[in-house]
């Protein structure tokens, strides 16, 4: 087991799926979701996004590095009769081996929140079906306070998320940065909803 897997297993040991929250980009824009189809919740954790997607009628695949999180989510999904398939995978290691295992044209919806591994992004976009939607939200370099990862490699540069979505139709983009009254607004993060042509 990798150090990263151990770290996340420790974090999820004391937490429960019932407390898992879906990301802002998803909850505020659920009206864009298809009524059925396949969805991927990448870096799922305890499955806030996966649970939200399944309750919206989608067949969900949840992938995370933490076996603890995936076990808890699998049990919760079964108890709640939600269509969520859980898989514990180290996608970063798989991407380094050039075999991330994300099939092309596999998903109608892909949701990623609070996770960034740049080498995986091209495969992620190819995994979208035509007209498929990407909901992505994660931390930015510009921040107020100390929220998010301390390692800047896990934070987006200004407009970086937009650049990664080049060739997709942008339905929504938000990155408030340090503009205006920093006590209000969507701070420390960027979000995008993009559709594959």
Show where each model-derived region lies.
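Conserved class I S-adenosyl-L-methionine
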Residues: 1-34, 36-45
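Conserved SAM-binding loop of SAM-dependent methyltransferases across substrates and taxa
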Residues: 46-58
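Conserved SAM-binding motif I beta-strand of class I
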Residues: 59-64
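Conserved SAM/SAH-binding beta-strand->alpha-helix loop
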Residues: 66-68
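Conserved SAM-binding strand-loop segment of SAM-dependent methyltransferases
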Residues: 80-94
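A short acidic, Gly/Pro-enriched loop at the edge of an enzyme's catalytic core
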Residues: 97-108
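Conserved beta-strand signature within the Rossmann-like core of class I S-adenosyl-L-methionine
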Residues: 132-139
